[in-house]
Amino acid sequence: MKDSIKAKLQSLIERHEEVSALLSEAGIISDQNKFRDLSKEYSHLEPIVKAFKKYTQALEDKQAAYEMLNEKDAELVEMAKEELKLANEAIEKLESELQIFLLPRDPNDDANVFLEIRAGTGGDEASIFSGDLFKMYSKYAEQRGWKIEVISASEGEHGGYKEIISRIYGDGVYSQLKFESGAHRVQRVPATESQGRIHTSACTVAVMPEADEVEGIDINPADIKVDTFRASGAGGQHVNKTDSAIRITHIPTGVVVECQDQRSQHKNRAAAMSMLKSKLLQAEIDKQQKEQSDTRKSLVGSGDRSERIRTYNYPQGRVTDHRINLTLYKLDEVMEGSLDSIIQPLVLEHQADLLATMSDE
């Protein structure tokens, strides 16, 4: 392991000890924001410290095994060779783990997200598929212990949604869903197709980190235009009789957000403002990424909505992620929310890309 990496790890261990001490101080305990932030930092540092302790122990085991090779007892020498082999394997594995821990961390990984799904080409079938995607993400969220709430929805004429915007909140939501942005294509025979022909439709997905208040996304009240309108009811039930739905336009950028699913105008306005801040935060993130032109383009894609990232082929029961050439013949499981078999390879590919970038520096 390079000396620079060891020095970085040592500084993290010292910081872990410092944070541990701070968390027991009365002044920190009484300040909820500081206590929360330090608790998060501690939870990030804890696995690094544990891995480094294992690494240090493996180095000691290796040294002890080397010394045993000089023994005259043949049985002890054989035992030493086996222990040396195990120690070298452990060192190699732990060095890889520690390198990944040291990768630059996305500051938004812990954020909640706004998930936008829009029907694209394909008419009614695209709307139906957007509904299928929303169910898929809802089931995945449930499996992860996350919560999901609908912010705004425009239903399709024959089912599904022309557009649905939801908020997903829980632990590490953005870290797992950030690679879902892009165009999702479906190939299947629609229920209305009498000739049995396969149709191709598409939906676009956008995943945006929710802007935290501490991130300082300030919006000048003079820069926004707020309109109220009557929320549409579902199937004629609970139709809103008042103009409680909110549409906010951010005049400098032209960004428009709507919210109509909360019970009051006040709640709809708060949700719409939160979504607007997240859109402006995402725009800032996109701008920064474009400015970093010298940085290698991520193998898992730019997150551009127009970029086709995945195909769901129903006749073959196949899902293909085009960014990493991953093909799985488990479409039914994926649509039931078993997304880890796709998401984890994307995360690993992203980590490998970052490691390659670090080695080039």
From Swiss-Prot:
It is found in: Cytoplasm. Residues 287-313 are annotated as: Disordered. The modification N5-methylglutamine is found at Q237. One of its GO terms (cellular component) is cytoplasm. Pfam families: PCRF, RF-1. GO terms for molecular function: translation release factor activity, codon specific. Residues 287-297 have a biased composition (Basic and acidic residues). PROSITE patterns: RF_PROK_I. Keywords: Cytoplasm, Methylation, Protein biosynthesis. SUPFAM superfamilies: Release factor. Methylated by PrmC. Methylation increases the termination efficiency of RF1. Its main location: cytoplasm. Gene3D superfamilies: 3.30.160.20, 3.30.70.1660, 6.10.140.1950. Signal peptide: none annotated. HAMAP family: Rel_fac_1. Peptide chain release factor 1 directs the termination of translation in response to the peptide chain termination codons UAG and UAA. Belongs to the prokaryotic/mitochondrial release factor family. This is Peptide chain release factor 1.
